[in-house]
Amino acid sequence: MSDRASSATTQDFIRSRPAEGALHTPDDRRVVALPAAVMQALHAGLPGESPETLRPVLYRAGYEWGLQEMLHLHTRLRAELDPSDQRDLWHLDAPFVLERWAAPFAAAGWGACVFDLSEHGKRLLFVELRHSAAAAASRDAKVNAPVCHLYAGLFAGALSFYDRTESHAVETECTALGHACCRFIVGPGPLIDRAETARQSGLAHEAIRRLSLDPKPAAPAASAKAAKIPWKK
């Protein structure tokens, strides 16, 4: 289990090249600095997109981004390891891998994560996120549900790469709703379906966590509606 917040300085992961007017990562990928207004506009809605269609767009973008960042990390770690030790990323310690994956996001202002891998044997990951850029962008908006769909996709993509099997994610608490931090549950699709339905029925995070750990199917609350999960076609 990793209960340490991922931490890093901007200088560790973002290098300025004043002569070029550019920012780059240590592995020479270009970085673009965007104002908070861009994030606000993105979550206010894309042209022609309703809130219902915007959610899966953000989730899928995050999912693919999470996969690609894990792929880049895999390449970097192979370069860092001793030539005689060329293990694949998924053979390395999960807390180490996830913290290395999350560190550039924290350095770039996307927030700091705490990863709880105590139930990783059941393919479950619990994430606590502080300083979510998406939640901050929605702070002044009237929202009645979690808004960090991009982050949910990121965490699902990262765990999918590490576990080499598809995982999904749901946000159960969000600072845009007044919670102290944003919380996510990442795991197999059927369990996340249940977690999303439970969230929609009004269950708190800890109750949803217990439900996701219970192998017995639980009857949904009378007021619960079928969950509209972003990754379902």
Identify the role of each PLM range.
Residues 1-125, 133-150, 167-181, 185-233:
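N-terminal accessory segment detector
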Residues 146-164:
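Active-site helix/loop of acyl-thioester processing domains in fatty-acid/polyketide metabolism
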